[in-house]
Amino acid sequence: MTEPNDTGPALQAEHLGKVYDEGPARIEVLSDVSLSVARGEMVAIVGASGSGKSTLLHILGLLDVPSSGTVSVDGVPAAGLSEKRKSALRNRSLGFVYQFHHLLPEFSALDNVAMPLIVRRENRDRARAQAREVLELVGLAAREEHFPGQLSGGERQRVALARALVTRPACVLADEPTGNLDRHTAHNMFELLTRVNRESGTAFVIVTHDPELAARADRQLHMENGRLQPD
């Protein structure tokens, strides 16, 4: 597998298409979508439900394959990679944050954050040390031994963000990261996302319905009928 290239875009997609054949019907979900995300850039993608935003995020995250077009992550083209190598690229160079935190309830905040490194068979002590660093970055150093059930909704989402950052990815893909939070907590999450983006130099691609969060991004793009265009 080609080694990551830290001088080019964190994430690049060219002429993506996605088509589902359902019986006699042919459903085009994405049409000729191209996107280049610079290192350290925050890009917001907005659009109505069903416009193709989540499908695009899944393809950018190497969780789905396009019907046409190419994706490169950290300078590495995904086309032609085996599932094992694609998984390794995803785990090394991408982080994910979802509307629901998906934390493991039986593990502490610290061990939830360290989990991506432990799965990669990193030394456990080193993984926990790295997890402590990112928990401090998101303001939860004092809560590392608490379990998800002992944390507020906003704290759980911050743990999820720390987990996405612990591998030091080139890019974090966030799908409605504030969608399950109340207005005040969502505002605090906006502040955290922009600060982490600035301080860590990690690129972010954020799918959101929230105009306030989208307005904080370096660039806003609008998805409509499977096509991506400047907002």
Swiss-Prot record:
The record's subunit annotation is: The complex is composed of two ATP-binding proteins (LolD) and two transmembrane proteins (LolC and LolE).
Q: Which branch of life, at top level? A: Bacteria
> Mind telling me what this protein is named?
Lipoprotein-releasing system ATP-binding protein LolD
- Membrane topology per record: Peripheral membrane protein
Residue positions annotated to bind ATP are G47, A48, S49, G50, S51, G52, K53, S54
Q: Where in the cell is it found?
A: Cell inner membrane
Recorded E.C. number(s)? 7.6.2.-
**In this protein, which residues make up the domain named ABC transporter?**
11-231
Q: Keyword Transport, does the record have it?
A: yes
Identify one Gene Ontology CC term for this UniProt entry. Answer: plasma membrane
Q: What species is this protein from?
A: Bordetella pertussis (strain Tohama I / ATCC BAA-589 / NCTC 13251)
Q: Which GO terms describe its molecular function?
A: ATP binding; ATP hydrolysis activity; transmembrane transporter activity
Quote the gene name from the UniProt entry.
lolD
Q: What does this protein do?
A: Part of the ABC transporter complex LolCDE involved in the translocation of mature outer membrane-directed lipoproteins, from the inner membrane to the periplasmic chaperone, LolA. Responsible for the formation of the LolA-lipoprotein complex in an ATP-dependent manner.
* UniProt similarity note: Belongs to the ABC transporter superfamily. Lipoprotein translocase (TC 3.A.1.125) family.
Q: Which residues constitute the signal peptide according to the record?
A: none
GO BP terms in the entry: lipoprotein localization to outer membrane; protein localization to outer membrane
Q: Which PROSITE patterns match?
A: ABC_TRANSPORTER_1, ABC_TRANSPORTER_2, LOLD
| KW Metal-binding (keyword) present | no
- Keywords, alphabetical: ATP-binding, Cell inner membrane, Cell membrane, Membrane, Nucleotide-binding, Translocase, Transport
